[in-house]
Amino acid sequence: MDIGGNKMKFSKPLFITVALLIALVIIVPAALVIPFAKAKVGEEAASKTPPAIESIPAPGKVDTAVQVAVYRDQQKKVETLPMEEYVTGVVASEMNASFEIEALKAQALAARTFVVQRMLSGGKKNNADVTDTVKDQVYKSKEELKKQWGNNYENNLKKIEEAVSKTAGQVLTYDGKPISASFFSTSNGRTENAADYWGNDYPYLKSVDSPWDQASPKFTSEQTFTVADFQKRLGVKVLADGKVGNIKDLTEGKRVKDVAFQGKTLTGKQVREKLDLRSSDFTWKQERDKIVVTTKGFGHGVGMSQYGANGMAAEGKKYTDIVAHYYKGVEIKSMNDYEGKLMVKK
C-alpha cells in the first residue's frame, strides 16, 4: 500500500491481529442474536422429547382368533369382534378423524394396548372384557359411524383404518408387560402424575410438558353454579365474605391437589367429579348468588394428551415419538408375544 508516495509494510503478526478483530466483530453479534430467536409452540418440549422407540416390531397380520368381548351399554348385550376391528371402532370414536395420521396411529397403539392389558388382567364384568363407554374406551360400530359421519364416512374410515393397519398388532410395554395406556383430550400445559390423580403410581405415567394443547378448543372453559347448588354438591358452606374455598396445594401437573373449606378438605379430583368439571385445574370466584368456575384442560390429565399428540404430529413427529413423550420408558412389542395368555375365542 502507498500512502503519500511512501510504501507502508504490514508485519505478519499485525495482519493476523487485524483479521481476528474483524472476525470477532462479525461473529459475536450473530452469536448473541441467535439464542433470542422466537421458538415455535412446543419447540422446547419437543427438544426434550425422547428419541423414537427403537426395535419396533413391524405391523403384522393379527390372528383373528383374538376376539374382544365388548359390552354394548345401550343395547345391554355383549358383542364379540376381532381385535383390529375393535381398535378401529375405538380410534374412530375417541379421536377426531381430521387429526394428523401420526396422532391417529398413536391413538391406535394406545387403544390396542389398553384392551390387551385389560384382557390379560382378567376380571370380566357382564361377561365382557370392556364396555363401550368412557369407563373403558368408547367404541362405535361401522353402522353407528355411518350415521355420525354421513357423507364423510368413506374418507374418514379409510384414514382410521390406515392408522390401525400401520400399527397392527403393536402394543406398548413396560418391564415386559402391556401398560395401562390411559389418554385424555386436552391438558393444561402439562400431563398429570398417575399417583396424584388416581393414587396409584405407574413409572411410565409421569407429568410431562404438553404445550401443544393451547391450540385445543377445549383448553379453557367456564361453568356457573348457584351458591346453593355448589354447596349441595360439595357438602360445604360458602362463607359470607365471598371466600369459596382455599386451594392449598397444586400437583406437579399444576392441578388442584387439595381445597380447604370451613371444617372440610376435598381433593381436586373429588371437586372435579362432584361438580362435573372438565379438569382438576380450576379457579373460581363468587358473583352475588353465583359461583363461576374456570378450568384449564379437558380430562383426567394422565397419559397421552390427544390434542398434544396432534400438535406433535403437525410438527413432523412420528407416532413413536409421541408415545415415547407421553409414556416414559416404554417399548413397542408385538401382541403375538402375549397371544397365548389372551382370552382367545374361536
Where do the PLM segments sit?
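Conserved, single-site charged/polar hotspot
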Residues: M1-K346
